[in-house]
């Protein structure tokens, strides 16, 4: 019996409201991913693009400090609304948690949060969304790859 060739099928579920996704990643921490992601977002905005930035580093979010954002995002009942600063739409777990509270989450909680940020944030007609990834190859990277970014 001859078997059929294996074909991998992805569930196509891109980040809604965006045209292009740029994920900024590195296996090592402290190499400037967040700084680069922020500067890239600002540069694209200065070129006239509509830009958003998603801080996907659940354990060490830096977007609140880099953008000096000290507020919580609003919700329309089903989706979170990104916070707009410098004409850039922003979302981070750091907007939803207390800075002093340690994030002691396991895989399923991280996966759920990343899916929420990818699918339940009302990104408004963006040309680019910059995803600031955490270091390594863990749950966040796997989750984003499975939702076909």
Model-predicted segments: where are they?
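Conserved small/polar residues in nucleotide/adenosyl-binding loops
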Residues: 147-149
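Phosphate-binding loop that captures ATP/GTP phosphates
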Residues: 50-105, 111-113, 118
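Extreme N-terminal, non-catalytic leader segments
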Residues: 1-27
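Short glycine/serine/threonine-rich phosphate/pyrophosphate-binding segments
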Residues: 31-39, 61-62, 136-141
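Short loop/turn elements that form and flank the Walker-type P-loop nucleotide-binding site
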Residues: 17-19, 47, 84-85, 124-126
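Phosphate-binding/switch loop-helix module in NTP-utilizing enzymes
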Residues: 97-143
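Walker A/P-loop phosphate-binding motif and the immediately C-terminal alpha-helix
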Residues: 20-57
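Signal for well-folded cores of large energy- and translation-related assemblies
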Residues: 19, 23, 45, 64-71, ...
């Amino acid at each position: 019996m001859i078997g059929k060739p294996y074909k991998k099928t992805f569930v196509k579920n891109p980040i809604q409201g965006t045209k292009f996704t740029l994920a900024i990643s590195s296996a090592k921490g402290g190499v400037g991913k967040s700084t680069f992601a922020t500067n890239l977002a600002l540069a694209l905005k200065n070129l006239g693009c509509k830009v958003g930035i998603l801080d996907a580093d659940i354990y060490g979010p830096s977007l609140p400090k880099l953008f000096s954002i000290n507020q919580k995002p609003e919700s329309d009942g089903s989706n979170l609304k990104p916070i707009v600063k410098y004409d850039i739409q922003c979302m981070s777990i750091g907007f939803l948690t207390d800075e002093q509270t340690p994030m002691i989450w396991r895989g399923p909680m991280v996966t759920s949060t990343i899916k929420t940020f990818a699918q339940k944030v009302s990104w408004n007609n963006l040309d680019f969304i910059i995803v600031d990834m955490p270091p390594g190859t863990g749950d966040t990277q796997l989750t984003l790859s499975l939702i076909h970014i």
